[in-house]
Amino acid sequence: MNILLIILASLFSCAGQLCQKQATTVSGGRRPLLLWLGGSVLLLGMAMLVWLRVLQTVPVGVAYPMLSLNFIFVTLAARWLWRETLSLRHALGVILIVAGVAIMGSYT
């Protein structure tokens, strides 16, 4: 259950970050900008609430490195949504993050 909450917190955080990115590229007035920023605040707030639940049951020294999942989620989403390039160095970094998270997460 803890790992699911950690993943959920990371996904909410990732979605909030993606809304912020989208807000920087929006044209067409103030309303779309405010919608993207509002979505970001809502998603980041949800991430915080889930994260507080995680911290009730998982040692912070174990839980905090799991937030590195955000690097993976944001990288993949940026590649998919905005066709951002993924260099070999960046891909290797993501792979190393996955390995580190797997090692840290093996406490359960």
From Swiss-Prot:
Cellular component terms (Gene Ontology): plasma membrane
Biological pathway: Bacterial outer membrane biogenesis; lipopolysaccharide biosynthesis
Gene3D superfamilies: 1.10.3730.20
Residue ranges crossing the lipid bilayer per the database entry: 32-52, 58-78, 85-105
EamA domain location: 34-106
Protein topology in the membrane: Multi-pass membrane protein
InterPro entries (UniProt xref): EamA_dom, Flippase_ArnE, Small_drug/metabolite_transptr
A GO biological process held by the record: lipid A biosynthetic process
Taxonomy, superkingdom: Bacteria
Compartment(s): Cell inner membrane
MF annotations from Gene Ontology: carbohydrate derivative transmembrane transporter activity
PANTHER family: 4-AMINO-4-DEOXY-L-ARABINOSE-PHOSPHOUNDECAPRENOL FLIPPASE SUBUNIT ARNE-RELATED, SMR FAMILY PROTON-DEPENDENT DRUG EFFLUX TRANSPORTER SUGE
Assembly mode: Heterodimer of ArnE and ArnF.
Role of this protein: Translocates 4-amino-4-deoxy-L-arabinose-phosphoundecaprenol (alpha-L-Ara4N-phosphoundecaprenol) from the cytoplasmic to the periplasmic side of the inner membrane.
NCBIfam families the record matches: PRK15051.1
Family assignment from sequence similarity: Belongs to the ArnE family.
Protein name in UniProt: Probable 4-amino-4-deoxy-L-arabinose-phosphoundecaprenol flippase subunit ArnE
Organism: Erwinia tasmaniensis (strain DSM 17950 / CFBP 7177 / CIP 109463 / NCPPB 4357 / Et1/99)
